[in-house]
């Protein structure tokens, strides 16, 4: 997009051994490099939206589709992290993840602050108590494998805004206060990517989402 391009056409190498890695690399490079977070910009740059491959066989097409699917979730993850903390509260994060995950048949379970207290999640409850935005506990279950298959567990840190609490971060750390939910965004996006590709595995992702911020009220 730095060149102002919105589309590109690429001729795939004729040698079969190069077709799949070539199309995979081009797809990932184009998708990831063209990502932009323009939500709050009055003047938005043109988006790169189309990449056309010539002479790609069925295997290369399959690799391209898989790469596109993964890159979509990588960019979804990036958009969650890029969103400002005043918007991406624990509840909004939970609702956003749930809406996207359920579209691909992923089981979603969200605990509110009352359930968090009842289940004895004291650390999550304690951190979230200082904020006006209560915490959420998120569980995603993707059941793509058989019941006898081992289950992969993923855990991601979900502090949607981390001021440092009573010990405020210095000015140099303020730009990154909203980034402490990157782990949560990554594991949730990974589960969604697995479900989109219908991988034959079982995955559970667990996220404790909260704000480490002292409410002025």
Protein language model features and the residues they cover:
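Flexible glycine/proline-rich, aromatic-decorated loop/lid segments
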Residues: 213-217
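Alpha-helical metal-binding/catalytic segments enriched in His/Glu/Asp
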Residues: 97, 152-154, 163, 167-211
């Amino acid at each position: 997009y730095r060149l102002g391009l919105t589309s590109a056409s690429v001729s795939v190498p004729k040698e079969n051994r190069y077709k799949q890695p070539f199309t995979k690399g081009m797809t990932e490079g184009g998708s990831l490099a063209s990502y932009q977070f323009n939500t709050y910009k009055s003047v938005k740059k043109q988006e790169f939206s189309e990449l056309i491959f010539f002479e790609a066989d069925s295997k290369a097409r399959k690799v391209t589709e898989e790469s596109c699917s993964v890159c979509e979730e990588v960019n979804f993850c990036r958009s969650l992290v890029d969103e400002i903390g005043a918007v991406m509260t624990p509840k909004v994060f939970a609702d956003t993840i749930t809406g996207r995950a359920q579209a691909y048949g992923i089981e979603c379970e969200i605990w509110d602050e009352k359930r968090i207290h009842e289940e004895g999640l004291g650390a999550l409850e304690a951190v979230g108590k200082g904020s006006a935005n209560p915490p959420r506990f998120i569980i995603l279950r993707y059941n793509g494998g058989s019941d006898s298959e081992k289950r992969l567990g993923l855990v991601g840190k979900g502090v949607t805004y981390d001021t440092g609490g009573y010990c405020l971060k210095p000015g140099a750390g303020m730009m990154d206060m909203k980034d402490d939910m990157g782990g949560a965004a990554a594991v949730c996006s990974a589960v969604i990517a697995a479900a989109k590709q219908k991988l034959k595995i079982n995955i559970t992702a667990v996220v404790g989402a909260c704000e480490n911020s002292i409410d002025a009220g």
